[in-house]
UniProtKB/Swiss-Prot annotation:
NCBIfam families: tegu_FGAM_synt. Disulfide bonds: none annotated. SMART domains: GATase_5. One of its GO terms (cellular component) is host cell. PANTHER family: PHOSPHORIBOSYLFORMYLGLYCINAMIDINE SYNTHASE (PTHR10099:SF1). Pfam families: AIRS_C (PF02769), GATase_5 (PF13507). The lineage of its organism: Viruses, Duplodnaviria, Heunggongvirae, Peploviricota, Herviviricetes. It comes from Alcelaphine herpesvirus 1 (strain C500). Transmembrane segments: none annotated. Keywords: Virion, Virion tegument. It comes from the Viruses. This is Probable tegument protein antigen 3.
Length: 1369
């Protein structure tokens, strides 16, 4: 019988913040003050074994040695084996995810990579490599420790929401029994989702189809509006078509595409699914692999009240609640790191109806994937008969990574496990490839319900088989089921029947089921093998389809050769019946105390600012990927100080130049460092008599002084088509009145979106994500919400669609609205930060009444309010039209929508973001000041020039919009509020900002050491730019494009920005994406069938990315992966030897790999290379930082940028360099091998030393290193993400100064192009085999091939036209 074995690997580490608290609590007990506690970071490795211990024994040893070698920290400390007996010999405390449950997502990702040792071997079956922590106790008092102290540690370190469990030897269950009991006992359905969206495979139309509505300005049909989250036809969108090149087969796919990608394109991170909306995309597709608490990405709430945030010293209860929230926020942040989607101001909200439930978070997202190319009907009896007539059989094939039973987030058993998103992407692309290369009619049906909630295997088999049955061998069952089965005989029939049903048929599956018609020669199976193997997508044949309708027959022979059958009746999901439980009533508001004369005090304002809904979201925004692979033109951080305030985001569809060029100068059609120019310059460089052209001394400098002629240059960037999205919600109020909450959510989404570069509000497409409890009246409630939303949107001439609908667990009602609109960037938009002292502040209201009920002021004060109103379409239309006029006429300097916290919070946030203050005046004598200041009536706060106030008010009157001047922007340290002449508030801005950021800072402190204090970010942002060259953009097309080989490593996101920057700069990038699994029938050094390698035709190699396994072990594991997938290292080493080619490494993992080649920073004395340091925050950082390019750097790419100080994006968990030989490392600067350094905010600030300007607080603030000859460059920051100025966090040349029209980072790529072209021409001259000195008389030169002179007399001089050797001809 199959069992499990366990090994423990660990190394001594610093205690975590929570462990520090536990140690302090333990030492406070009398007698334990001097106890010695050693903390260790560890991994539990379990593997399956058989009763025969010698079976595969050598392979087991090799696998464990491989794992041991891979588990290393950033400073090369190795995880060493610890005998399990050591855990019992003394008092120890081991805790982590439950070892007797499903492996965690991080474990799955590590195991997947580590099991790729060799394609020719059967790798030993590792079950998990799961992270845990150890505490060893010794010294005085340790003998007193007992189960009471153990319980104390368990209470602190293994709370209800940490999902960690203590581990002891006796708790380890070596059997596999738990696999048979962890799956849900019944089919789980989301009745709300099923009712709203129906089922495409069963031709069940959902109720949403009755409400989805396309406006005249929404260029999609009624049937498409459910699938496509666009508001217009996207004409210019990147076409990343994939061509799988397999020997003897050739290319597949479009040959005319600009970007080429080769076989093995598989290991991708979260790609969104177009068939679900904003909430659904995040919830169902974006939970990345390394999350330990993947309850995020659901619907947008913090579900418990946060207390004690205003205290300087938090109580024990507050710390515990903060810890629970931190787990959630960290997981939510990691969800977005590799997703490549826009983050629209992360927000949290308190719900009055929920208590002690796990926290959740929500972000806006936009899917830009296309529709699947396959819409096939399930097979019928006629289909089977037709196949049999042609001597074919119908086979059912399982495609993809099943991950049985791991997809239900609401199942607490599986809460530690969630698919990373890459599996879904691999499956989606592999199925596309299969449809391209398979002959028509051979793929009968594809059932891919991996994108929905209902993914039960039984349902999927029933849908795939249609009217037919399935006959399969027991050997085709999944491995985890086979491990649980007893011997296949009549005696164990009932037991095996139950195991197959409970562990396979009744659980979720993330795989797709494909029905194919194949013959005895397996023609279709072979093509399937090609298509799916190219993507690294696993598949196996389950069985044959039979005429036995709706029956699954699993058979095999027993030990006597008799056939033993187990039969199951197929089940199809039916339209859910009415609920059995009534929908809970909304809260009774009649007994709530209402405030009438609440005073406006400093304490009230500080309470509101401290509220998590209003407070700063830096703990989220600064620790997630904000750049979306370069597609995001507006992320949450705004203003010179990168304050996360923006409530809309802009996603650009196409990163390649050529979208919109209105207003640009006329430029020549093509540009290039052509042959004629290059040859003359090369000849001039080597014109000294006797100088050999093969002399490499000068070769490296070729092309470094050449500049592209000015007639090809423009000082403006092309505009791009994009999509603007805003989010709105009113979850707290929705508990009381779902219909009014729906309207308020739609209005807020529109007011957010209109601030972006939108030109026509009638192009809005409103998407709704609905969550209601399942009860008797849930259908009526859902229909009422959709009907109300459709009527409101149709009155506004908006398009409307239901993005998602789901069961609101915990009696939760929630409606989140997204407003999408097409836009052009850069375009007129209003950012929420004050820009100019002396400017006027205007309040623009949707309605003259105040809206206070359910607002943040009520929550903070504990006193309710009854003031509400219902917005009308005409009011919203007038408000949006007015805002479009203000933007079009450039009458406003900045703007912010009024929502949570009211007018006063919007003003405070604009002060924080702009570094200025404000003076507010309430003019109405009869009005209580608390009402206008804290009212959450939809509207805007506008900053305008004083001379434009009258013009704006006149236009507001024209559109019947209330517009009132309420104050002015001042350059002061104090914020003041007056009610006529009475001063209500006078508060230092620093105190307001401290309270606004208090919650965010409290969360950040949970990730640092006990004695570590993160400094105030007072110096962050407001950068000064220094240029030594005038930047320009090239719009002309390149004549010939040098090839660049881009290696994407396992776990790294797709580099759209990199490919676009290379393409826009004249290169032709070839991308090789590695799937993390070996290919069959392949040489050891190959990683993908037919993928390109570095050769004379490759101008350079780019290594790109950071691992999505969030630990040092992740990068170390990738390095071990490289030991058996040698193509990357072989390519890099071959490229290092080839003169005239460059290597560029961007990202922490790419830098580590380049350092491993010893090309950069290698110290021959110590035989050491640089290593990377972890961030001081111990978290992923996404920062807009200032960098200086040294004046004397040898880096070829930075030749034009020498001496410049420029800001750029830097993202990752390890953003600093160091070296074991510090003296040698410091000398790199004098050797001119430092390519870039972290710089302070101003040019004269010099090198940055503190966090966050130097994220690791490294002694040597190096951000980029280069080789001795400058050809090879390793960068921690990513210039690709700042290639266009609209990608910049904040575009200014200095504090309070103007903007740059063109990004200087373009010059980096232009220089690489020129350098590469010159070296191509130089190699062409070498290949002509002429004499190696130039005398400028071709008749004196030798003919390259004398034996091919033909009829030309040997004695006659041979004249060779100069252009005859032009390689571009």
């Amino acid at each position: 019988m199959i069992t499990r074995e366990l090994q423990l690997l660990a190394y001594t580490a610093e205690p975590s913040a929570l462990e520090t608290a536990a140690i302090a609590a333990l030492r406070s007990i009398p007698g334990l003050q001097n106890v010695i506690i050693q903390t260790q970071d560890a991994y539990l490795v379990t593997f399956f074994t058989s009763p025969r211990p010698l079976r595969e024994h050598q392979l087991k040893i090799e696998t464990l040695l491989f794992i041991k070698a891979a588990l290393r920290t950033f400073d090369e400390q190795q995880y060493l084996p610890i005998p399990l007996s050591a855990l019992s010999s003394s008092f120890t405390f081991v805790y982590g995810p439950d070892i007797n449950r499903l492996p965690t997502s991080q474990s799955n990702e590590l195991t997947a990579i580590l099991q790729t040792r060799d394609a020719r071997e059967k790798v030993f079956n590792v079950e998990r490599i799961q992270h845990c922590r150890l505490l060893f106790f010794s010294g005085p008092g340790s003998e007193q420790l007992n189960h009471t102290h153990y319980a104390l540690l368990r209470e602190i370190l293994c709370g209800d929401l940490t999902l960690y469990q203590p581990f002891r030897n006796e708790l380890f269950n070596s059997s596999l029994d738990f696999y048979a009991t962890i799956y849900p006992p019944r089919f789980l359905k989301d009745k709300v989702r099923h009712y709203v969206h129906g089922d495409i495979n069963l031709n069940i139309t959902g109720a949403a189809s009755n409400y989805n509505w396309a406006s005249p300005h929404t260029a999609v049909t009624d049937s498409e509006i459910f699938r496509i989250p666009y508001t217009h036809v996207v004409r210019f969108i990147d076409r990343w078509e994939i061509r799988v090149r397999v020997p003897d087969v050739g290319f597949h796919g479009s040959r005319g595409v600009r970007f080429r990608q080769h076989g093995g394109a598989a290991y991708m991170c979260s790609t969104l699914n177009s068939t679900t909306g904003a909430t659904g995309c995040l919830q169902k597709g974006m939970i990345t692999s390394f999350i330990s608490q993947p309850t995020l990405g659901q619907l947008g709430l913090i579900t418990e009240p946060m207390c004690g945030w205003g205290q300087q010293e938090l109580s024990a209860t507050a710390i515990q609640m903060l810890t629970k929230y931190a787990n959630t926020v960290e997981a939510f942040a990691k969800t977005l790191n590799y997703a490549g989607v826009p983050l629209v101001q992360g927000f949290v909200t308190l719900s009055p109806t929920l208590r002690e439930k796990r926290a959740m978070a929500f972000t806006g997202s936009l899917s830009i994937t296309g529709l699947p190319p396959y819409i096939l009907k399930p097979p019928t009896a006629e289909t089977l008969d037709a196949a049999m007539e042609r001597n074919r059989q119908l086979l059912l094939v399982e495609v993809g990574y099943p991950d049985y039973g791991k997809g239900k987030l609401h199942n607490p058993v599986n809460i530690m496990n969630s698919e990373s998103g890459r599996h879904a992407h691999i499956l989606h692309q592999a199925l596309r490839q299969l449809m391209i290369i398979t002959p028509f009619g051979k793929v009968i049906h594809i059932c891919c319900d991996w994108q929905y909630n209902e993914k039960v295997t039984m349902f999927k088999i029933a849908k795939a088989c249609g009217d037919l049955g399935l006959s399969m061998s027991a050997r085709s069952l999944p491995a985890h089921t086979l491990r649980l089965l007893k011997k296949w005989n009549f005696r164990n029939l009932n037991y095996n029947h139950r195991i197959i049903k409970n562990s396979w048929l009744k659980v979720d599956s993330a795989a797709a089921l494909v029905v194919i018609a194949d013959n005895e020669y397996q023609d279709v199976s072979k093509k399937m093998d090609i298509a799916l193997s190219g993507w690294g997508c696993p598949f196996h044949i389950l069985g044959n389809l039979t005429p036995n309708s709706n029956t699954i027959v699993i058979s095999d022979k027993n030990q006597y050769g008799e056939i033993v059958d187990i039969q199951y009746k197929m089940h199809m999901p039916k339209q859910p019946s009415e609920g059995t439980e009534d929908t809970p009533l909304a809260p009774d508001m009649s007994n709530i105390q209402l405030f009438k004369n609440l005073d406006v005090t400093e304490d009230l304002l500080l309470q509101v600012l401290r509220h998590p809904t209003v407070g700063c979201k830096a703990h989220i925004v600064h620790h997630v990927d904000r750049c979306g692979n370069g597609h995001i033109a507006q992320q949450p951080g705004v203003g010179p100080f990168d304050i996360p305030l923006c409530d809309f985001s802009v996603t650009v569809h196409n990163l390649v130049d050529g979208d919109i060029r209105e207003g640009m100068e006329s430029v020549p059609r093509v540009w290039a460092a052509d042959w004629r120019v290059a040859r003359r310059l090369i000849e001039t460089q080597y014109s000294t008599p006797g100088l050999d052209i093969t002399d490499a001394t000068l070769a490296n400098n070729l092309g470094l002084t050449y500049h592209i002629p000015s007639e090809h240059q423009v000082t403006v960037e092309s505009k791009k088509y994009g999509n603007c999205i805003g989010i709105g919600e009113k979850t707290t109020f929705t508990q009381r009145d779902p219909l009014l909450g729906t309207i308020l959510a739609i209005v807020e989404s529109c007011t957010n979106c209109i601030l972006g570069p939108v030109e026509n509000y009638e192009e809005f497409l409103i998407g709704l994500s609905i969550s209601v409890p399942e009860g008797i009246h849930y259908r009526h409630e859902v229909n009422s919400i959709m009907a109300m939303a459709k009527d409101f949107c149709s009155s506004m001439n908006f398009g409307f669609q239901v993005n998602s609908a789901e069961n609101g667990n915990c009696l939760l009602r929630s409606v989140v609205a997204t407003a999408n609109a097409p836009c052009v960037v850069p375009g007129p938009s209003l950012k929420p930060y004050f820009k100019k002292p002396g400017s006027a502040i205007l309040r623009v209201n949707l309605h003259t009444e105040h809206f206070l009920s359910g607002g943040i002021c009520c929550m903070a004060s504990g006193i309710g309010a009854s003031e509400t109103f219902t917005p009308t379409p005409s009011q919203l239309r007038n408000l949006l039209q007015f805002m479009l006029i203000v933007k079009a006429e450039n009458l406003a300097l900045s703007g912010h929508d009024v929502s949570d916290g009211g007018l006063i919070c919007a003003v405070c946030e604009m002060m924080f973001a702009g570094g200025l203050s404000a003076r507010l005046i309430i003019h109405d004598e009869d009005e209580e000041p608390v009402f206008p200041l804290f009212s959450e009536t939809p509207g805007f706060v506008l900053e305008v020039n004083a001379i434009d106030v009258a013009a704006i008010i006149a236009r507001a009157n024209l559109y019947n919009v209330e517009c009132i001047q309420i104050g002015e922007v001042v350059e002061s340290d104090t914020f003041t509020v007056f009610h006529q002449n009475t001063q209500l508030l006078s508060v230092p801005v620093s105190r307001l900002k401290h309270n606004w950021t208090l919650f965010s800072k409290s969360v950040d402190l949970l990730y640092v050491k006990e004695d570590q204090v993160l400094p105030e970010e007072t110096s962050y942002g407001n950068y000064e730019v220094h240029l030594t060259v005038d930047p320009y953009s090239i719009i002309s097309q390149s004549t010939t494009r040098p090839n660049v080989l881009v290696h994407l490593l396992p776990g790294c996101g797709y580099p759209d920005a990199l490919l676009a920057a290379l393409t826009n700069s004249g290169f032709s990038p070839d991308t090789v994406v590695y799937p993390g699994c070996k290919y069959r029938h392949n040489r050891r050094e190959d990683a993908a069938p037919g993928s390109p390698t570095a050769d004379d035709f490759i101008a350079g190699i780019v290594l790109y990315g950071s691992s999505n396994i969030d630990s040092d072990v992740g990068d170390s594991t990738i390095r071990q992966w490289l030991n058996v997938n040698r193509q990357v290292i072989n390519d890099v080493r071959r490229n290092l030897k080839a003169k005239g080619s460059f290597t560029l490494a961007i990202g922490q993992l790419a830098c580590r790999i380049l350092f491993a080649t010893k090309a950069i920073g290698f110290d021959a004395g110590s035989q050491q290379t640089p290593f990377l340091l972890p961030n001081a925050s111990r978290r992923y950082e996404s920062r807009w930082l200032n960098f200086k390019i040294p004046e004397d750097t040898k880096a070829v790419a930075f030749r034009d940028l020498r001496g410049c100080v420029l800001p750029c994006w830097v993202q990752g968990t390890h953003l600093g360099f160091s070296h074991n030989n510090i003296t040698f490392f410091g000398d790199l600067e004098t050797r001119q091998q430092v390519a870039a350094t972290f710089n302070g905010p101003l040019v004269q600030s010099g090198p940055a030393r503190e966090y966050p300007l130097n994220p690791t607080e490294a002694e040597h603030p190096y951000a980029g290193l280069c080789s001795e000859d400058g050809r090879h460059l390793a960068l921690l920051f990513d210039p690709c993400l700042a290639f266009n100025t609209w990608q910049w966090q904040h575009n200014q040349t200095g504090p309070g100064q103007g903007e740059l029209p063109v990004s200087p980072w373009k010059l980096m790529f232009y220089r690489l192009y020129n350098w590469s072209k010159f070296h191509q021409h130089y190699r062409s001259l070498l290949r002509t085999n002429l004499r190696h000195t130039f005398n400028f008389e071709t008749q004196q030169l030798d003919f390259p091939h004398a034996d091919r002179r033909g009829a030309v007399p040997h004695d006659n001089p041979q004249y060779i036209p100069m252009d005859a050797m032009d390689p571009s001809q």
